[in-house]
């Protein structure tokens, strides 16, 4: 199976997000890479489902709370930018303060 670098990146994000989802379900607090992957994957899937950029910008800030992540993680993530594939092309989604 031949994958482009972009496809490899998407697969890596998905894998990290799946791990983060499982850890969160077990009650563990997420670290920085897990939190970023969790939010990024949700944004990418939302784009695939046909949500708008504006919807995803708001949605991205509702996925995790301070209680879901380790101390200091919210301050490490002032914003997340995701290049997501929408039905009408690729667009940049920026989520400001993703962990309020």
Curated annotation (Swiss-Prot):
Database matches in NCBIfam families: PRK13241.1 (NF009712), urease_gam (TIGR00193)
Species of provenance: Methylobacillus flagellatus (strain ATCC 51484 / DSM 6875 / VKM B-1610 / KT)
Primary location recorded for the protein, binned into one broad class: cytoplasm
Location in the cell: Cytoplasm
Protein name per the record: Urease subunit gamma
Catalytic activity: urea + 2 H2O + H(+) = hydrogencarbonate + 2 NH4(+)
Pathway participation: Nitrogen metabolism; urea degradation; CO(2) and NH(3) from urea (urease route): step 1/1
Pfam families: Urease_gamma (PF00547)
GO cellular component, one term: cytoplasm
InterPro entries listed in its UniProt record: Urease_gamma, Urease_gamma/gamma-beta_su, Urease_gamma_sf, Urease_subunit
Highest taxon in the source lineage: Bacteria
Keywords recorded for this protein, A-Z: Cytoplasm, Hydrolase
Subunit structure as annotated in this protein's UniProt entry: Heterotrimer of UreA (gamma), UreB (beta) and UreC (alpha) subunits. Three heterotrimers associate to form the active enzyme.
Keyword Coiled coil in annotation: no
Single GO term (MF): nickel cation binding
């Amino acid at each position: 199976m031949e994958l482009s670098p972009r496809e490899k990146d998407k697969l890596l994000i998905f894998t990290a997000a799946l791990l983060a989802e499982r850890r969160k379900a077990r009650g563990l607090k997420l670290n920085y890479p897990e939190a970023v992957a969790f939010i990024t994957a949700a944004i990418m899937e939302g784009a695939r489902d046909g949500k708008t950029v504006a919807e995803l910008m708001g949605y991205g800030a509702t996925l995790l709370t301070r209680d879901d992540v380790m101390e200091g993680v919210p301050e490490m993530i002032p914003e997340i930018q995701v290049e997501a594939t929408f039905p009408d092309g690729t667009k940049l989604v920026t989520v400001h303060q993703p962990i309020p």
